[in-house]
From Swiss-Prot:
Residues covered by region (Aspartate): 211-214
Name listed for the protein in its UniProt record: Aspartate--tRNA(Asp/Asn) ligase
GO BP terms in the entry: aspartyl-tRNA aminoacylation
GO molecular function: aspartate-tRNA ligase activity; aspartate-tRNA(Asn) ligase activity; ATP binding; nucleic acid binding
Assembly description: Homodimer.
Residues annotated as binding L-aspartate: E187, R233, H461, R502
Biological role: Aspartyl-tRNA synthetase with relaxed tRNA specificity since it is able to aspartylate not only its cognate tRNA(Asp) but also tRNA(Asn). Reaction proceeds in two steps: L-aspartate is first activated by ATP to form Asp-AMP and then transferred to the acceptor end of tRNA(Asp/Asn).
Organism: Chlorobaculum parvum (strain DSM 263 / NCIMB 8327)
Binding site for ATP: R233, D234, E235, E495, G547, L548, D549, R550
Site (Important for tRNA non-discrimination): H44
Origin superkingdom: Bacteria
UniProt-annotated location(s): Cytoplasm
Enzyme nomenclature, EC number: 6.1.1.23
Gene this protein is translated from: aspS
Membership in a protein family: Belongs to the class-II aminoacyl-tRNA synthetase family. Type 1 subfamily.
Amino acid sequence: MSKEPTAAAGLQNRFRTHYCGLLNRDSEGAGVKLGGWVHRIRDHGGLIFIDLRDHTGICQLVIQPESGELFRIAEGLHSESVISAEGSVVLRSDETVNPRLASGAIEVVVSAIKIESAAHPLPFPVADYMPTSEELRLKYRFLDLRRERLHENIIFRSQLTAAVRKYLTDLDFIEIQTPILTSSSPEGARDFLVPSRLHPGKFYALPQAPQQFKQLLMVSGFPRYFQIAPCFRDEDARADRSPGEFYQVDIEMSFVEQDDLFVILEGMFKHLVETMTTKRIAQYPFPRISYKDVMNRYGSDKPDLRIPIEIQDVTELFVNSGFKVFASNTKEGCCVKAMVLKGMGNESRLFYDKAEKRARELGSAGLAYIQFKEEAPKGPVVKFLKEEEMAALKEQLGIETGDVVFFGAGKWEQTCKIMGGMRNYFADVFPLDRDELSFCWIVDFPMFEYNEEDKKIDFSHNPFSMPQGEMEALEQHSPLDILAYQYDIVCNGIELSSGAIRNHRPDIMYKAFEIAGYPHDEVDARFGHMIEAFKHGAPPHGGIAPGLDRLVMILRDEQNIREVIAFPMNQSAQDLMMAAPSEVTAQQLKELHIKVELPEEEA
């Protein structure tokens, strides 16, 4: 919660001279005016107690029966009505002190009270927590935002945003706003399109990110840029992704290398964690893991490093195995992976059946495992393995009696992802420390990948990243062996941001697009404005853009991103409170030269 002076500095008027949650023993004897919401009201045998709430907290008002008209007004109050009250601060008796409230040592004896706004019956309680459907919470978001946890989340978000601004401006970053109405880009997610009235048949797009603008700012000579940037993407919702719009801490720097950006971001996150939370960072500086290594060891490019399980490669152990399922996957491009769960080898059959079901959901044909029981190893693949293979497994994996080892075999990428999915599935077995923040950088992403569907080389991630080795790499190396200066920052299994050192040279850009099958004229048609700018002197530059919503979500221990956004949409990208999206009038459509053709309803 924000810390403000007890007196309402600069706001002393007929409504308020003090804040409820900031009154304390030092306020004894003070005459105060308070304004807020009726949190609770209790009638204790002639005395009426009102818990009055403002954004700083709660204080108790006392109305005595001899108050006459005041008592009558208080008797008619309902929860969440807005009142203003005047009175004197007195100390509570020792036995009535409420240690759960910051103002619990005092109460205000009321001498005047006024109902500013009477509340109708509530669709759900604000003062007392009661499970409430998300639909109802979003429809009455103005009530939901009064609830303590959500209210504190929004205040925390404001404080975090202010701290980010101060940290970056202290490092000589310049905050610059970029356009909200811009041109549509065919790359990435779907755009939100805005029709132009003045240019019939043409459309603006809301920016998916200020990517091109911030790079152009580097070309314009601004060395360090940032913006708390709104971004708009027409994509489906997830627990950690809000549909429609989100905010990111957009950062770009010129004349930098990858390590320079890492130092800035690590310092900022460390500062935010240490000054705004009681959490601790597991390792600082943050560990850096190559894409290939992170897939081999964790089966995901956004690993939760708190999970005490690591995937190991056992391909070499089965090159000459009689177990064909493993032996057939020791060839180039395939692998055999293993994962040990310490002390979990004596679980019930149901445990393994559920695990196999999850593996099939992830795309596996099944789930091979061996339980290393005290009497003898047990499991569906034991009979296929030789004694020396079992011994080699135990030695390489450090297996002890009571452990269980799970296997995956097949094409490298698919097998890694399935094993990574199982690693996350088994995470529930282990108590994870919610106060530990395991940040890491994922680096050395491949520049290109082979598109199986189109049977061609394509960009694996950002086509505007600088290839490691620059032009020499593009001309002399196989495309699938080229790495890019691309990086992700991950915390506790959540990707906070992607970033890159940009490709600022038109010759390298043309060559990279040529490898991916794009001729010069197509590159010029799509990105001519960027290339034109780069032809007029572009400095080396790079950037990153951590998601503000996700960062608040992690630091506040929330499982759903809608718990850190004031007015979010639902899973179907609808604003239930404002009834958006909505139909518009025929006149509005006519002015925009638009005709709506709705899809035919299925029979």
